[in-house]
């Protein structure tokens, strides 16, 4: 009975993911129109040339695979260059949190912001820690750590793939990761997308270890370690619980109840205890005063409502809808109860009724299209004059403002307002199209293995989360990129001897 249920459920998952990946591939190709009509022509010619000269392409990939250290070293050089040359360093919410942590805002301002956005308190405390230790130099300590986080993720995913899949998969996942994330300025933006990347890679590694081991001889150290790691990672990025849910689901369908009870109980308890302990510490911190009033803080329901806005992340539309439930004379008050649960629930119901079944399907399709579209992973650093709360690079005025090389870097790699940025965007989109082809290839045939089912569930869970909650930005995929890259690499490389059935 359980075996039959497993075949049916994972068969349904396979069918859903195949449709999702067909859509992903088509969107990644058609997004070329947003870059330029010449981009479509150029991409078509390049892919045709690559097919005609596929032996040469294979040799080029093999050469890159043999020179991984050099490829990663080049990425580190790139990171240093863009970090030094950037003008706009941190933007939007990340800039508010940083300025508050480094005492560049009034305490009342950061208190008001964090009271409204308590999900950013862990990031504030993290940045405050480095400010207390290093003063203003704490910024550069964190940037070096960001470089460590992003590059360590490449190494861990490579080693994971070597152990659990095959060398070809390992080579591809390394090249994808370094090309998309390491050769990117995202690391210095101070979003919480980057720090958990190596932790997610470890989470996937240890989960795959446990799925591979003889269930009668599972290591207690690995079970407890996975639970502790997951609890810590959840504080940074709560969505990492999706990896654990996928792990528990695959373990459940094995039907070995003794092993499932042992592993699930210990990992659930350790994950829960660690997360609850750290979360309690965050909620009772005394570094910055937090106001506790009904309807002041943004809760989980609000992000479901935000996900129902036209693009899936339209803050102005969300606020405008909620203001309809507030008396006109109170709409400008700081704490007018805007985010009360009853108001949010009314607004969610209104939006769902307004969409109707077909409208909701269309909304989900559009939102998913925005989520998977961009090879730059949604990089959106515009010229400074368009930013509300910019934090300018301390090196800009004294060092790089009038430097020719720095201007060239900002023009071609950092500012999306510049027409020259489209060359970089085009190259990234080509890589994204190949990635999406790998994702599609992974589901063109059924791969009924525990390892693949686990990764597939982890990807599906991430996409489902972005469908229900705030979404519509490719940047939101970064938190799920390790499992996405693994599935794409498996699709391009195929499984060989190390499949685990």
Model region roles, listed by residue range:
Residues 157-179, 198, 450-454:
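Transmembrane-helix signature of polytopic, membrane-embedded enzymes
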């Amino acid at each position: 009975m359980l075996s039959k249920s497993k075949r049916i459920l994972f068969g349904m998952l396979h069918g859903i993911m195949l449709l999702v990946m067909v859509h992903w591939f088509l969107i990644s190709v058609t997004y070329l129109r947003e870059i330029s009509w010449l981009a479509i022509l150029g991409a078509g010619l390049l892919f045709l040339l690559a097919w005609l000269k596929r032996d040469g392409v294979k040799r080029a990939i093999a050469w890159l695979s043999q020179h991984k250290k050099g490829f990663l070293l080049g990425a580190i050089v790139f990171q240093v260059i863009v970090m030094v040359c950037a003008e706009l360093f941190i933007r939007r919410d990340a800039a508010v949190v940083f300025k508050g942590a480094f005492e560049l805002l009034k305490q009342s301002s950061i208190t008001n912001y964090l009271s409204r956005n308590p999900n950013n308190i862990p990031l504030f405390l993290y940045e405050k820690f480095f400010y207390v230790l290093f003063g203003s130099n704490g910024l550069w300590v964190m940037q070096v750590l960001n470089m460590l986080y992003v590059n360590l993720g490449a190494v861990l995913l490579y080693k994971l793939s070597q152990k659990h899949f095959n060398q070809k998969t390992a080579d591809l996942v390394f090249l994808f990761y370094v090309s998309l994330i390491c050769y990117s300025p995202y690391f210095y933006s101070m979003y919480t997308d980057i720090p958990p990347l190596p932790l997610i890679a470890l989470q996937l590694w240890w989960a795959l270890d446990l799925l591979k081991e003889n269930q009668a001889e599972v290591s207690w150290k690995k079970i407890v370690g996975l639970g502790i790691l997951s609890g810590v990672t959840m504080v940074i990025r709560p969505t990492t619980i999706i990896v654990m849910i996928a792990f528990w689901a695959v373990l459940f369908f094995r039907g070995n109840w003794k092993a499932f009870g042992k592993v699930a109980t210990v990992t659930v308890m350790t994950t829960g205890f660690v997360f609850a302990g750290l979360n309690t510490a965050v909620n009772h911190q005394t570094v910055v005063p937090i106001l506790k009033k009904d309807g002041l803080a943004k809760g989980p329901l609000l992000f479901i409502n935000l996900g129902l806005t036209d693009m899936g992340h339209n803050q102005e539309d969300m606020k405008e809808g909620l203001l309809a439930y507030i008396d006109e004379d109170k709409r400008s008050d700081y704490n007018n109860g805007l985010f009360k649960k009853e108001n949010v629930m009314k607004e969610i119901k209104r939006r769902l009724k307004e969409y109707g079944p077909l409208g909701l399907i269309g909304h989900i399709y559009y939102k998913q299209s925005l989520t998977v579209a961009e090879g730059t992973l949604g990089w959106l650093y515009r010229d400074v004059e368009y930013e509300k709360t910019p934090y300018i690079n301390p090196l800009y005025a004294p060092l790089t403002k009038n430097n020719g090389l720095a201007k060239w870097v900002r023009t071609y790699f950092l500012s999306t307002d510049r027409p020259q940025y489209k060359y970089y965007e085009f190259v990234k989109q080509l890589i994204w199209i190949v990635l999406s082809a790998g994702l599609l290839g992974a589901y063109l045939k059924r791969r009924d293995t525990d390892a693949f089912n686990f990764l597939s569930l982890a990807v599906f869970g991430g996409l489902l989360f972005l469908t229900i909650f705030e979404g519509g930005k490719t940047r939101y995929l970064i938190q799920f990129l390790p499992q996405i890259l693994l599935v794409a690499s498996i699709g391009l490389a195929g499984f060989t001897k190390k499949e685990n059935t």
